[in-house]
A protein has these predicted regions:
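Terminal accessory regions of large proteins
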Residues: 1-191
Length: 191
């Protein structure tokens, strides 16, 4: 309803794209065949893991590339993307863009994600202190991932803040390319 759909590498938001997709399949095909239908989709996508993990991975890594191909590099969904570490990603529908969207994205999603990383890092710090040697290696690797994502997201938050303060209005008649460029610092690069 707020035109912001987070794409996460874990279940951080109730309304992330994977959760919404699962809910869509549940509503259309029913609860009884949900797992079977998710497995069908996951098998079609390919990849390793549970059906939900495969679907999550597709949205995180491949969906936007497919979307750009479909729309010949003039996307109607825009991917807000913090960078290679996947610190933060979210889709918005261009035709529903409103000038306060970046402020909402920043406060309702970016800040929320930053808080999740702080919580995860605190919990991992405690767990590492009390872990066995083999477990410590695994937890330290997770900690490094979260530290990298948090650092990436901190830099990204500053860029989003700068653009949010500008309260940018778009004119759909200017076209996707022009409007996308207004937000180039915070959107995925079109390749």
């Amino acid at each position: 309803s707020d035109n912001i759909i987070p794409i996460c590498d874990d279940e951080y938001f109730d309304d992330d794209v994977t959760g919404r997709f699962v809910e869509f399949v549940r509503k259309v095909y029913g609860e009884d065949t949900l797992e079977e239908n998710l497995k069908f989709v996951a098998d079609a996508l390919g990849g390793k893991g549970t059906p939900r993990e495969v679907i999550r991975s597709y949205f995180l890594d491949d969906f936007y590339t497919d979307h750009l191909k479909t729309y010949q590099k003039r996307p109607i969904y825009w991917l807000f993307d913090s960078g290679k570490k996947n610190g933060f990603k979210a889709l918005i529908y261009m035709h529903r863009y409103q000038r306060d969207l970046l402020a909402r994205l920043r406060t309702d999603y970016v800040h929320e994600q930053q808080e999740r990383y702080r919580t995860q890092l605190a919990q991992l710090g405690d767990a590492i202190d009390h872990a066995s040697t083999s477990e410590r290696v695994k937890l330290t690797k997770q900690q490094k991932k979260f530290q990298d994502q948090a650092a990436e997201l901190q830099k990204y938050e500053e860029k989003v803040h700068h653009l949010a303060d500008q309260n940018i209005e778009i004119d759909l008649d200017d076209g996707v390319k022009h409007n996308y460029e207004l937000f180039a610092d915070v959107l995925a690069k079109i390749k």
